[in-house]
Amino acid sequence: MTRADAMGLLLAFIARLITGAQGHWKGCPPKAEQRIYFANHQSHLDWVLIWAALPHELRASTRPIAARDYWTAGRFKHWLTREVFNAVYVSRQRTDDQDPLEPLVEALRNGDSLVIFPEGTRSNKGLPQPFKSGLYHLAEQFPQVQLIPAWIDNVQRVMPKGEVVPVPILCTVTFGAPITLGPGEDKSSFLLRARAAVVALQPVESQLQAAAP
């Protein structure tokens, strides 16, 4: 076992210890198929939670998307995301001739699964912000890859935006039934439907808390 493998097991254990990192599969089983998991985004811990909630045998082929400027700023963060999580780095500062999806396209061509957050940025408002177009373009280019919606619950209370120390809170990740890009479906309709598939997985308790004054 390599040091990176050992660190991965340790981090999965810590994530489950602090948050529970319980994965609930509704509409799809945890199978070794190429997938794009797309979820709501509220914390830097989001992709760690999804990764920890996956069965061990799926983690090696499932790569999170990570902001290059943040996750390569520092030797440990860079090593962690590169060696342990095998992250796909994306640049938030882009040139006009740069395709922001190219790293994701390359990973999918190599047979990897991905964890992405179509909002593009974190939100602490409960419901996801409008989805950006990346998911639509990936669905167009890779119709054979399953698109799995996921709802991460309670993680904003573990590590809210701006905080650096996690608080022990039970979290869940609910994986829903796969969606597909319909024949002739336009970008706007697909993104609205994809967002609705994520929101539909929100537990009733969380909906009531969000609606409370």
Predicted segments with their positions:
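Catalytic core of membrane glycerolipid acyltransferases/transacylases, capturing the structured
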Residues: 31-93
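A short, acidic/glycine-rich surface segment
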Residues: 48-49, 72-75, 99, 156-162
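Catalytic-site beta-strand/loop segments enriched in glycine and acidic/polar residues
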Residues: 107-136
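A cross-family acyltransferase "interaction/gating" segment
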Residues: 79, 125-188
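A charged, well-structured terminal subsegment
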Residues: 100-102, 106, 171-199, 205
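Residue-level preference for the first positions of well-ordered beta-strands
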Residues: 34-36, 113-117, 146
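A conditional alpha-helix N-cap/helix-loop micro-motif detector
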Residues: 94-98, 128
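Helix-to-loop junction immediately C-terminal to a conserved catalytic motif
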Residues: 3-5, 10-41
